[in-house]
Amino acid sequence: MKDRRRRETVSWNRFFWCTLLLVLSCVLFTASTFREKFQPEIVSAWRQPAMEATTTIMSTNSPAKPSISIRETVMLPDQVLIFVNYPQSSRLFTKEDFSCVYFSRNSTSLSETQLKKPPNQIDGTDVNNQIVRCPLNPRGFSVSLELKSGGGYINPGPTHRWDSLVYEAMIDRDNTTVVFVKGFNLRADRIYNASKFECVYGWDFRKTKFVLRSNVISIAQEIVRCQTPLSILNNQLKVNNAIKVSIRLKGKGTLHSIARPGVQLLTDPEPGLRGEKPHEMCICTMLRNQGRFLKEWVMYHSQIGVERWFIYDNNSEDDIDSVIESLIDAKFNISRHVWPWVKAQEAGFAHCALRARGLCEWVGFIDVDEFFHLPTGLNLQDAVKNQSNSGNNVAELRVSCHSFGPSGLKHVPAQGVTVGYTCRMMLPERHKSIVKPEALNSTLINVVHHFHLRDGFRYVNADKGILVINHYKYQVWEVFKEKFYRRVATYVVDWQNEQNVGSKDRAPGLGTRAVEPPDWSSRFCEVSDTGLRDRILQNFLDPLTDLLPWQI
């Protein structure tokens, strides 16, 4: 009897454990099946820093979506910049692929979206740095993106204000980090005490145990030069998509940052047999919605000796992309750099100077409505050599600007600004500069019109009989009124504001409203000047078609 009871006990024990094993197997199988079907893809922490919430597409319409994410969002005064990350294998999307979606900040889900708008534009060709520009969100609303193809909403990333932000950074060839920052409101044209600030590197600046700190070498305007920690330099290729850099005023908090130092600037290319750089003469410019004027500006300057153009695009919404592509197809050496930052022209010019330094002997910093004019017919390169031969230490030519008026016109001249506008003010206004980027002061201080130079270098004023700038400043009203939108320079007051109304940057007598005066077409006309017009018609006009190259 005892043996029988023992056998029954063993049988029940075996039954219990077999049943339990079967149930657990079913549970694990079910969980595994549902996890494969519904679990969202985890964005790799290598690509997505720990400080940022994982922001993948959330949709019930399709289980197989690429893990597109919003890295961060920056609120500008008139629009929103949304920085989008893609998987490396994904194609770049276009403006037509996205909708900007707006939802109440009290919403608990993106499904409660209350408003959709098309993006203003989409910029960038890098899967880690594409920018979708959305219309500004209404008060009380947040903004995110929807991928139209599958109805997928993308969770919003961290949001920052544009006026208190570290927005760009690059590691220079001397291994320092050049950082571009808004929020300190430093005065123009002045170097500040670097010991009051420090540089901060890390994934999450809120976790002070996991950040690196380094000394500020110099700080002026919106440009900070930092001593880069060795651990950042030694692991640069591994961490440059994750590590951020920021600046802290000692005793205060660390500024928000979206700036990743990125790949170190390339060292200068191998020089030629005589030590020349690839290009003798280059131009940097910053523009917004100037696509229709760009062909004339590039083609003309190419003929007088400019070899390379750096275009900094400040949130254009015209067809600037296609214009630049057509110029590239025509063998012009031109590149577009997206520079979305508001009132940051000085910083943009400094950024451009660093990029051009290894490629260009001389760089001119002018606008698209400004044209170098050589009254004697010299080539620009020859004129620069002529004007800078007073010593090896000349590193900047300051070129006087003549301001042209509407010249009696009421519509945009069909043959271009150089032919259409022929009447100007008698005396020059201000100047613009051609500089040797190698000779710039390490602070990169500039006031748009000229730079600070290193010790031992000097500037000269160009002879107005040899080299001047025709500035087509006061064009027909439909073009000129765009200047009221916003001035791009950091230290220049927007024209709608009452401050500094008497500035030379403004048009005399216009006030703060974009209202066309009845006599606008006849203003700013003191001297007839057809010098550049005559040269254009003589050297550029096709005798068979009577067309200029930029009209084709």
Swiss-Prot record:
Keywords: Glycosyltransferase, Membrane, Signal-anchor, Transferase, Transmembrane, Transmembrane helix. InterPro entries: Glyco_transf_92 (IPR008166). The keyword Transmembrane helix applies. It is found in: Membrane. Its EC number is 2.4.1.-. Its main location: membrane. This is Glycosyltransferase family 92 protein RCOM_0530710. It comes from Ricinus communis. It comes from the Eukaryota. Pfam families: Glyco_transf_92. GO terms for cellular component: cytoplasm; membrane. Residues 277-520 form the GT92 domain. It is a single-pass membrane protein. GO terms for molecular function: glycosyltransferase activity. It is an enzyme of class 2 (transferase). PANTHER family: GLYCOSYLTRANSFERASE FAMILY 92 PROTEIN. The chain crosses the membrane at residues 12-34. Belongs to the glycosyltransferase 92 family. GO terms for biological process: glycosylation.
